[in-house]
Amino acid sequence: MHNVDQQELSKFEQMAHSWWDPNGSFKPIHLLNPLRFNYIQTKANGLFGKKVLDVGCGGGILSEAMAQAGAIVTGIDMTTEPLEIAKQHAIENGLTIHYQQTTVEDLRLNHTACNAEKFDVVTCMEMLEHVPDPLSVIQSCKALLKPDGVLFLSTINRTLKAYMLVVIGAEYLLKMLPKGTHEFEKFIKPAELLTWCDQASLECKEMKGYHFNPLTEKFWLNNDVSCNYIAMLKAK
């Protein structure tokens, strides 16, 4: 199976039952989602009526927010149980989201074969650090993007600070995430991400860091990318 880590998939399969529990295993994503959604919507100049691809959509937290904003959303993931939960949750909330169990590489091949319309916006949030070949994902995201489209990538910097906050802090001390959710050696430095994006003929227009206050349980953005960060990219 191309560019899939079965151990990584099994982690998320095991946590799937609590995907939509705001106080469960995915509490950090529920807390982060309004910030990242607003950033994406603003930088994409609105989402209404736009064709959007959410790569690594999991249980559909971001996909649903974008669909509620009027986007025509396709969500893809290689997990089974989280995708079923995503489909059911969308139905319960009266949302039309096209969920598919596929890799972005295979979706790219199918789109090319069918000469299908490309996407105005592609998002790949907190997924690159969970796949064997991040460059392959980025290249396929670029191939599925319209010439004037916008790609959003988010991941975690490979720094001591990120290790202390994301692994030790979030997984072991605050217990906001199950232990073993992240592997430090898979974290991605911004320079590495930018090199891959350059190889995929993508230009970074902006990069911002996510930051979290555990006392207020609030996230905010600034220019410090030493931990979690998001990049906005366009085709060269």
Swiss-Prot record:
Record-level Gene Ontology MF annotations: 2-polyprenyl-6-hydroxyphenol methylase activity; 3-demethylubiquinol 3-O-methyltransferase activity; polyprenyldihydroxybenzoate methyltransferase activity
Residues involved in S-adenosyl-L-methionine binding: R36, G56, D77, M125
Pfam families reported for this sequence: Methyltransf_23
Keyword match Protein biosynthesis: no
Pathway the protein contributes to: Cofactor biosynthesis; ubiquinone biosynthesis
Listed transmembrane segments: none
Keyword Transferase recorded: yes
Protein family membership: Belongs to the methyltransferase superfamily. UbiG/COQ3 family.
Name of this protein: Ubiquinone biosynthesis O-methyltransferase
Species assigned in the record: Haemophilus ducreyi (strain 35000HP / ATCC 700724)
Gene expressing this chain: ubiG
